Structure formats: structure tokens, C-alpha cells
């Protein structure tokens, strides 16, 4: 919306499959009609995503896509690896004389990018809210089956932030922080 307000002739492309689409030059033009269906819902199902790290061999493919679509800017959405890739790719594009500028939108549920410049990342609050809701549902169901124990494991490189946030919202009987257990070398009986 903002881009078209500033310049109605602007075009926005989305690369299908994330960086793999960028490498292959496979994209669609994002138009108002298409975007209406996905507004405020995320959008992974619109374009898909990939977890590819950009290698030096891929740089030339990125240049080909940037040139083919005459891109003034390239927005990468992701976590720490994406930010690192964007930094290296930016240097390469600058040294190659390509006009495309790169912007990174931090999106990472594990808060790996939180620092003095990034207060929070897109995805963390949504992830915590969703996890808390699911844990709350399980807590409600478990009241009717008191003879069973329910264990919920949250995944990630360092899920402690999510565990603590979800525990504050859903009030489970126990919340075990795996980093603390590992640091103290606790056994199952000690936990």
C-alpha cells in the first residue's frame, strides 16, 4: 500500500519458494487482488519459503534476477542466517555495480536477533500467543484426565524465551528450561 501510494507505477514481486525462487528467477507480481486474500495472515502459503543459505555460487543467480526484473530493492525476511546472507550479498552487489539495495525484516520466533537495534522480531509474539493457546487447551483437557501427565516440548535453537512467555500466559504446573537443565547437568530425577 505504502509503496503504491508513494509511486503508483511501482511493482512488487514475490519470489516463489523464497531464495530458491530468487536463484531461479521464479516470481509473481504481487497485486492488490492477490494480496487481499493474505493481508494480515502471514503469507507463507502465498509464496512459500526456503531455508537455503545463500552461497557464493548463488550470487550470480541473484544478480541475474535483480537485473531481469530491474529491482531497485530486495526485501529479505528471516532470522540471523538471513541477516548474515543479506550483509554478504549487499557487499557483492555493491562491488558488482548493481543498483539493487537490500533490506532485511527480522522475523524469528527464537529472538536470535534481539539487540540494541532490533527491539523485537516479527513472529515472536505470534508464536508465543499460538503456543500459549495450545498449551492452555491441553491444560484444560488434562483436567478431565487427571491420571495422565502431559509433556509439551518447544523446539528452537534457544527456546527458553518462548517457554517463559508461554508459561506466564498459560500457567502450567511446571516449566522446564532446557538450557538451565543442561548448564546444571541435571538428571531426570533432579528435574
What are these regions (language model features)?
Residues 76-78, 84-88, 92-101, 116, ...:
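Accessory alpha-helical/coil subdomains and C-terminal extensions
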Residues 12-14, 44-47, 102-104, 151, ...:
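Conserved beta-strand scaffold positions in the cores of enzyme catalytic domains, especially
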Residues 17, 79, 105-107:
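Cofactor-binding loop segments of dinucleotide-utilizing enzymes, especially the Rossmann-like FAD-
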Residues 21-72, 81-82, 109, 120-125, ...:
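Glycine-rich oxoanion-binding loops at beta->alpha junctions
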Residues 10, 72, 173:
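Short acidic/polar active-site loop segments enriched in Thr and Asp
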Residues 1-23:
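N-terminal phosphate-binding or glycine-rich loops at protein starts, especially the Walker A/P-loop
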Amino acid at each position: 500500500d505504502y509503496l503504491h501510494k508513494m509511486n503508483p507505477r511501482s511493482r512488487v514481486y514475490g519470489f516463489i519458494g523464497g531464495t530458491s525462487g530468487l536463484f531461479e528467477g521464479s516470481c509473481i507480481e504481487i497485486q492488490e487482488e492477490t494480496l487481499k486474500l493474505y493481508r494480515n495472515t502471514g503469507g507463507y502459503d502465498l509464496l512459500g519459503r526456503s531455508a537455503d543459505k545463500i552461497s557464493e555460487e548463488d550470487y550470480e543467480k541473484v544478480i541475474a534476477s535483480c537485473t531481469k526484473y530491474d529491482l531497485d530493492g530486495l526485501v529479505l525476511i528471516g532470522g540471523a542466517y538471513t541477516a548474515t546472507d543479506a550483509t554478504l550479498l549487499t557487499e557483492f552487489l555493491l562491488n558488482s555495480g548493481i543498483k539493487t539495495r537490500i533490506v532485511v525484516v527480522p522475523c524469528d520466533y527464537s529472538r536470535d536477533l534481539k539487540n540494541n537495534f532490533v527491539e523485537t522480531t516479527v513472529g515472536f509474539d505470534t508464536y508465543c500467543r499460538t503456543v500459549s493457546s495450545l498449551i492452555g487447551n491441553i491444560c484444560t483437557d488434562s483436567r478431565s484426565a487427571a491420571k495422565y501427565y502431559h509433556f509439551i516440548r518447544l523446539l528452537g535453537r534457544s527456546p527458553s524465551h518462548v517457554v517463559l512467555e508461554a508459561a506466564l500466559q498459560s500457567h502450567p504446573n511446571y516449566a522446564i528450561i532446557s538450557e538451565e537443565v543442561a548448564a546444571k547437568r541435571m538428571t531426570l530425577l533432579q528435574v
